[in-house]
Design a protein with these regions (language model features):
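Helix N-cap at the beta1-alpha1 junction of Rossmann-like dinucleotide-binding domains, i.e.
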Residues: 95-97
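Rossmann-fold cofactor-recognition segment
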Residues: 106-120
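Rossmann-fold NAD(P)-binding glycine/threonine-rich loop
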Residues: 163-190
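Conserved Rossmann-fold cofactor-binding substructure of NAD(P)-dependent oxidoreductases
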Residues: 118-131
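Conserved N-terminal Rossmann-fold NAD(P)-binding element of oxidoreductases
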Residues: 63-70
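C-terminal catalytic/substrate-binding lobe primarily of soluble NAD(P)-dependent oxidoreductases
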Residues: 212-456
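N-terminal Rossmann-like NAD(P) cofactor-binding module of classical short-chain dehydrogenase/reductase
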Residues: 128, 134-138, 160
């Protein structure tokens, strides 16, 4: 592993080799002329209090996770299951008691907890200074992405998230706000990994893997997301209700022939067959990974995203829309300003508590058409995840699991040096192979279908 970061002068007295090798920016200590006391080369990177042993890649894997919902529950528990890499974990949230409950379930590794307001950059920086992480994993709200990225730059620590930035007062999300940080992260020698959940995240890695191994040109991409589970609630969302409802009530959007096309929300739909599930009505939506994938794979002629919804879910959603409960505009109630969708979130079931009675499975994948050696080829790569198995392993339902596990894998890729590059990057811009290998190891095995009917 090598470093590309530039660190301010700081010296670690002790085991420093006498040779004058280039350290990639990590400073050699004042005892550089002393005989080496070890065959290993040890350098100290002061911004994170990070000791790096070059030869055997033995390092302090200090991770700070922001957010304490269902995804964080999975990510932190999976980090603890990989304690050889994640040697020191802190979980921080606005409500420390939520962090404490997650930490109490983990027996083999100490997980420290802290209270932090992710909207307060100075507060974040003080927490970073106290814990000195190597990587900050942002599993908080998308509204807080830029605050956390700013704090990472102020302190000097790398960054990973699972969802792109969305303004609090506008139901609109796109990568442009975060891509604008690319030069700042590069100049600071820091890595920012964007969208490392399942979709976005694994879907980008699936696409990169297909492009690397199975296609010379990608022509069409359809990302298909099916939740064939039953949580036995009249109405509930599988992740943060506010974010979920804002997402699915936006206009649909897809890419074709070099242009973006809009559709009315959930107006385009068709039945698609999902492995081990069967046919499910699937609705065309806009999803953030489309923006980066058409940019990084310019041979794509069309890219779309589809998600399944049951009729009961859609009926409840229409009623809530019709009575104004999904609005993001503040209203006055008894002299107090409230946002209807935030109130709705408060009364809906907590997604983190759905797992116990959840049955069924998810099925998410990429259906791709393109050319290989001059011949047209179709390819479908997907994962199915059991809600019951996810709950038995982590205490969370399958949607949280399919997001939290990739976040952990992305952090692991960073700590191991496989996904470490100054700048701001989407996951498909890294080598997909080690990530794909980890999916099979960490509980999200994937499957491939060559030459099948893509239905799209």
């Amino acid at each position: 592993m090598s470093f590309t970061r530039n660190f301010a002068p700081y010296y670690l007295a002790g085991l420093i080799p006498s040779r004058k090798e280039e350290t990639g920016g990590c400073d050699r200590g004042p005892n550089a002329d002393r005989p080496a006391a070890s065959l290993e080369m040890v350098y100290f990177c002061p911004i994170q209090n990070h000791t790096q042993t070059i030869n055997n890649i033995d390092f302090m894997g200090k991770i700070l996770v922001v957010g304490a919902g269902g995804v964080s529950t999975v990510a932190v528990k999976k980090m603890a299951m990989n304690a050889d890499v994640f040697t020191d974990i802190m979980l921080a949230s606005r409500t420390k008691s939520k962090c404490d409950r997650i930490a109490e379930d983990i027996k083999n590794v100490r997980v420290r907890t802290a209270e932090v307001d992710a909207d307060n950059e100075d507060e974040l920086v003080r927490l970073f200074e106290d814990f000195r992480p190597e990587l900050v994993v942002n599993l908080a709200l998308p509204y807080q992405d830029l605050h956390i990225m700013n704090a990472c730059l102020k302190y000097g620590v790398s960054y990973l998230d699972t969802a792109n930035y969305e303004p609090l007062d506008e139901a609109k999300y796109e990568y442009s706000w975060q891509w604008a940080y690319k030069d700042r992260f590069r100049e600071a020698g820091l890595t920012a990994i964007l969208g490392c959940g399942f979709d976005p995240g694994v879907t980008g890695v699936f696409t990169a893997y297909a492009a690397k191994h199975h296609f010379d040109e990608l022509h069409t991409l359809d990302i298909v997301d099916c939740n064939a589970g039953d949580h036995h609630k009249a109405f509930a969302t599988n992740f943060n209700p506010e974010i979920n409802i804002r997402e699915i009530t936006q206009k649909g959007r897809y890419y074709e022939d070099g242009k973006w096309h809009e559709t009315e929300p959930l107006s385009v739909h068709q039945a698609l067959n999902y492995p081990n599930v069967g046919p499910r009505e699937s609705y065309l939506m806009y999803h953030e990974e489309l923006e980066s994938l058409v940019k990084n794979y310019p041979t794509l002629r069309r890219a779309r995203f589809w998600m399944t919804f049951g009729q009961e879910y859609l009926t409840h959603l229409r009623v809530m829309q019709n009575i104004g409960m999904t609005s993001i505009k503040p209203i006055l109630y008894k002299g107090v300003e409230i946002v209807p969708i935030q109130f709705l979130k408060a009364v809906l079931p907590d997604p983190g508590e759905l797992g116990e009675n959840y049955t069924g499975e998810t099925s998410i994948g990429c259906r791709i058409r393109g050319l290989k050696d001059g011949c047209e080829q179709t390819y479908y790569v997907y994962n199915n995840c059991s809600h019951r198995a996810a709950y038995e392993e982590t205490g969370a339902q399958g949607v949280s699991y399919t997001t939290g596990v990739p976040a952990m894998i992305g952090a692991k890729m960073f700590l191991e040096g496989q996904w470490r590059r100054p700048g701001v990057w989407n996951v498909e811009e890294f080598d997909p192979d080690p990530f794909m290998k980890e999916l099979n190891v960490q509980g999200l095995p994937w499957h491939e279908i060559f030459g099948g009917d893509l239905e799209l």
